[in-house]
C-alpha cells in the first residue's frame, strides 16, 4: 500500500491537464501507440470539441521511479468547470494529492482557485506544476509569485514541464512519488468505498468508479449502498489503465471500477458509500450531498410527435448524468415538453447539444430560470421554477430569490468595468483583495441575473481576462414581479419572465420591440404587448402586409376607390378574428439576449 499514489489534476479550462494526463499514460505504457488518441480520458465527443472534461475518468499506471521501486499511480481526472464543482469535490476526496497545473503564460484563474481551495479544505496535498513553459510568452517567475499571492501555497521551485512536447513529464511523475502521501486505511476493517463517479454501459448496466478507503472488496461479495439502502452483488471488479483490466479484489487505498446488477444510476449516487452486507461499516464516509438543480428550462420538440422520442432521449442521458432532472409540462404556446433542471448554464448547453447531436432532436428551449421561494398570505411556502406557475399577485406575501456568492478574478485595469457590471446586476460587494496584478472581487449576486447573460458580459467587459466561480448562498426576499408578453391579446406562457420591479418597464419595452422585429408580418396587424398583471406597460404593432387594391384604378371616381379600400378593411378584420400567430424559435431565443443595456 505504501507504493500507491492517488492524485488528481486541478486546472483551468485549456491549461493542459488532459494533455498532461495523456503524457502520463504514454510514459507509463498504459496504452500502446496505436491506441493513443489525443485526450484519451475525455471520451465524449463534446468533451473533446469544447476541450473540457465533464465526467471523472481514471487511469491506474505503473511507474518505475528513479529509486528503482514500482509505484501504482491512480490518476483521477476531474472536471474543471464551475457547473461541475460537486463532481470535482468527489474526485478530490478520493485522492491524497492533487497536481495544480497552471499555464505558465496565463497565470492563475478563478476556477483553479476555487478547486484548489476545495482541495485544501479536504486536506489534500497540493503540488504546483507549471505547464506550457515552451511557449514564448511563458513567465514562470511571475506565475510562481501569483500562485503564492493568490492561493497561498509555496510555489518556489515548482516543477516546470510542457505536456505537449513532453519536456519535464518525468520530473512531474517523480514529484508525485516524492510529495504526495501514500493512502491511509485498514485492509481488515469493515469495507468503506466511496463512489467517485458512475455511468451507464449498454452491456453491463451501471459502472461505478470507486475508491476503497477501508477494507477489501472481492468478486461475488454482497454489498449495500448506504444512502439508498439498495443491496446487490459484485459482478466484476477491476482497474482502468485507461483500458479496463479485470481483478479479483480491490484493497484499501486502491481506485477501480465496480459492476453490480444495478441498472439505474439513481441507486449508485456519486459520493455514496458502499459497504458489505455481511460486515457493514458503522457509518458512511462524510461529504455526500444530493445534487440540487440550480437552473431550469423548458425543452420542447419542434414536431409534437417527437415527444416520446424526447422522453427516451432524456431518460438515456439521465443514465449517464444523475444531476439532470426532468418532468413533463404542457405549454399553450409550445405544446407538450419537459421542464428540466440543470447544475448551471454550461450543463444546460451540453445537454441541449447532446440531445441534438446524439439523438437527432429538433428542440425549442425556453429562457432559463431559477427557483424562487414564494410565501403565500396563508403562510404556506412553495417553490416556483416556472414563471407561468407563479400564483396570483394578490395571494403572495413575499417572493424570495436565490443569491449566489461570486468570486471574480480580474486584472487591475478592468476592475472598474466589472464592478459596474455587478452593480447593474443588483450585486452587493462583499470583499475586494489586491493580489499582485490581479484583483479578487467577491460579490453577492441574484442568481436570476447571472443565468441570463452575466458570464458573456463579464468576458466582454474584461476582454476575456476575468474568470468567475460561484456557489449558492441563500434565499433573500426581493421585490419581484411577473412580466407577461401578449401577442394579439393572448398571453404566451413560454415567454413569461420574473423580473425585478425596477427593471420591469425597461425590460418590457425592450422585449416588445424585439418581438416586433422577429414575428413575421401577417395579413393583419398584430399587437405585441408587455403586461404586469392587468397593466400594459409597453406595446408595439407588427404592421400588416397589404395588397395595393387601388393599382387597377386609373383616375376615376373617389367612391370607387373608397369601396375597394373598405372591402379590404373588412376582409382584414375578419382575418384578424380567426388568424393565429406562429411565434418562431428565434423569438424565444431573443428573450435570452435582451440585456439590461
Swiss-Prot record:
Q: Where in the cell is it found?
A: Cell inner membrane
Q: Which reaction does it catalyse?
A: GTP + H2O = GDP + phosphate + H(+)
Record-linked CDD domains: EF4_II, EF4_III, LepA, lepA_C
Tell me where on the tree of life, at the top rank, the source sits: Bacteria
Protein topology in the membrane? Peripheral membrane protein
Biological process (GO) annotations held by this record are: positive regulation of translation
Keyword annotations for this protein?
A: Cell inner membrane, Cell membrane, GTP-binding, Hydrolase, Membrane, Nucleotide-binding, Protein biosynthesis
Q: Could you give a GO molecular-function term held by this entry?
A: guanosine tetraphosphate binding
Tell me the ranges covered by the tr-type G domain, including all copies. Answer: 2-184
Q: Where does GTP bind?
A: 14-19, 131-134
The record's EC number reads: 3.6.5.n1
The record, for Pfam families, names: EFG_C (PF00679), GTP_EFTU (PF00009), GTP_EFTU_D2 (PF03144), LepA_C (PF06421)
Q: Name one GO cellular component term.
A: plasma membrane
EC class, as a word, reads: hydrolase
What InterPro entries does the annotation carry?
A: EF-4, EFG_III/V, EFG_V-like, EFTu-like_2, G_TR_CS, LepA_C_sf, LepA_CTD, LepA_IV
Q: What does this protein do?
A: Required for accurate and efficient protein synthesis under certain stress conditions. May act as a fidelity factor of the translation reaction, by catalyzing a one-codon backward translocation of tRNAs on improperly translocated ribosomes. Back-translocation proceeds from a post-translocation (POST) complex to a pre-translocation (PRE) complex, thus giving elongation factor G a second chance to translocate the tRNAs correctly. Binds to ribosomes in a GTP-dependent manner.
Q: Which family does it belong to?
A: Belongs to the TRAFAC class translation factor GTPase superfamily. Classic translation factor GTPase family. LepA subfamily.
Please give the name of this protein: Elongation factor 4
Q: What species is given as this protein's source?
A: Neisseria meningitidis serogroup A / serotype 4A (strain DSM 15465 / Z2491)
The lineage is: Bacteria, Pseudomonadati, Pseudomonadota, Betaproteobacteria, Neisseriales
* Name of the coding gene: lepA
